[in-house]
């Protein structure tokens, strides 16, 4: 089997899990959003952002930047994965807590990948993210909108020092 076929099959397995899930409690909600994060970052199915973010969702980052709307959030994910095309996230912990008619979903994961492309971070450096240092924490508020659970607000904190180190050009 070709590598592309294997990667496609792996992605479709994750997609099938997502599509067949019954979302009934904290555990299933947490798993649903974990799988979507895997589709977006590990399989580069960036369009999945539109499946899990409300049209008017707001993503706030550690540096104070705010991305308003699913399209802006998709563009941010695309820019990040462009810099690290082999990016993989490793979910270390995740859970959800019901609060009224919403859930709060927490995720803690690490990232690995190599800065292989020209991007918003500058030219490719071929330096790797160090997963033991490249930690991400995220808290999202999800709500059922037109029958689908969607993120309406999210706060995500990347380890920017780790990302900057991987993107820093070599000393001349």
Predicted segments — roles?
Residues 1-47, 51, 55:
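Short, low-complexity N-terminal intrinsically disordered segments enriched in polar/charged residues
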Residues 1-17, 131, 150-172:
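Low-complexity, intrinsically disordered terminal/linker segments enriched in charged
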Residues 27, 83, 151:
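Contiguous, function-dense segments enriched for cysteine-driven chemistry
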Residues 30, 34, 46-108, 113-117:
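A solvent-exposed, acidic/Ser-Thr-rich amphipathic alpha-helical stretch
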Residues 40-41, 109, 155:
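Tryptophan-centric aromatic hotspots in well-structured domains and transmembrane helices
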Residues 58, 148-150:
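Residue-level signal for well-ordered, solvent-exposed loop/turn and beta-edge residues enriched
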Residues 77, 91-96, 135-143, 155-156:
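Hydrophobic/aromatic beta-strand elements that line small-molecule binding cavities or substrate pockets
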Residues 109-147:
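Exposed beta-sheet edge and beta->alpha loop/turn motif
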């Amino acid at each position: 089997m070709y590598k592309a076929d294997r990667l496609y099959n792996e992605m479709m397995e994750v997609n099938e899990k997502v599509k067949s899930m019954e979302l009934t409690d904290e555990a299933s909600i947490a798993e649903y959003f974990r799988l979507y994060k895997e589709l977006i970052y590990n399989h580069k199915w960036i369009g999945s952002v539109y499946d899990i973010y409300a049209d008017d969702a707001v993503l706030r980052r550690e540096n104070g930047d705010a991305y308003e709307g699913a399209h802006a959030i998709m563009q941010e994910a695309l820019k990040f994965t462009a810099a690290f095309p082999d990016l993989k996230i490793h979910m270390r912990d995740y859970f959800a807590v019901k609060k009224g008619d919403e859930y709060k979903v927490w995720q803690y994961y690490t990232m690995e990948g190599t800065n292989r492309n020209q991007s918003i971070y500058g030219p490719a450096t071929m330096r790797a993210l160090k997963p033991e240092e490249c930690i991400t924490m995220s808290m999202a508020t999800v709500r059922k909108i037109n029958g689908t659970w969607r993120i309406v607000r999210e706060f995500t904190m990347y380890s920017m020092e780790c990302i900057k180190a991987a993107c820093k050009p070599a000393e001349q």
